Amino acid sequence: MTTRQDGAIPDFLKMDDAIGSDPANANKTGNWHGWPTKDLNPVTLMDDEGRTVRIRTPVMDLEGLITPTDLHYTVQHFAVPPVVPTDQWELKIHGQVKNELTLNFAQLRRFPGRSVRTVMECSGSDATFFEYFKDEGPKPSRTQECMILSTGEWTGVPLAAVLNAAGITDKSLYVRAVGNDEGVPATAAEGTKPFYYDKGLPIQKALHPDTILAYAQNGALLEHLHGARVRL
């Protein structure tokens, strides 16, 4: 019988059996049951074209506060979008502003920069923990449903600087950020048409100095898998 405690690590924090970090261990349904070895290789899933589409962070094995970039978790709701060359990337600000604004990558980087260290966790991280804790469900897979948690240093331009350049008004209540990744979520109703991933921010949050348009992570320009060219 499984017990809640085994030494210093509670059962619900134990990792899945360590079978290495080779994506070939994913079964035919695409589920990944491995955990990285102590060399801290990330747990990854690949798409049909051999591109990494998901990473889980080995939180219990890390040293220090900053998660290395290649171990920083990723979650994909849609397919990974095509790479946008730097000279073709644009940021458009429109709606309830005095002056609609379009910036290319070089123009965005002319704004004063700011670096922010922050902890990020997916809202779905360990979603089934409490069912297990109340003996109402099986032990969650650490690599499937948890360890979607990382810390990084992000460098970019405060969103407030760009919004102020466009000129917000009394009617500017929310910011709707629309990304470049397009698709249909697995949980969407039948007949849902593809759409671009988007998120909303109250204007107070958008104007916070730590809300930035990041173009670098951990001292290097953003990688495509982590949101390049720019990540909000």
Language model regions located:
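Structured, non-membrane catalytic/scaffold regions adjacent to prosthetic-group chemistry
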Residues: 2-231
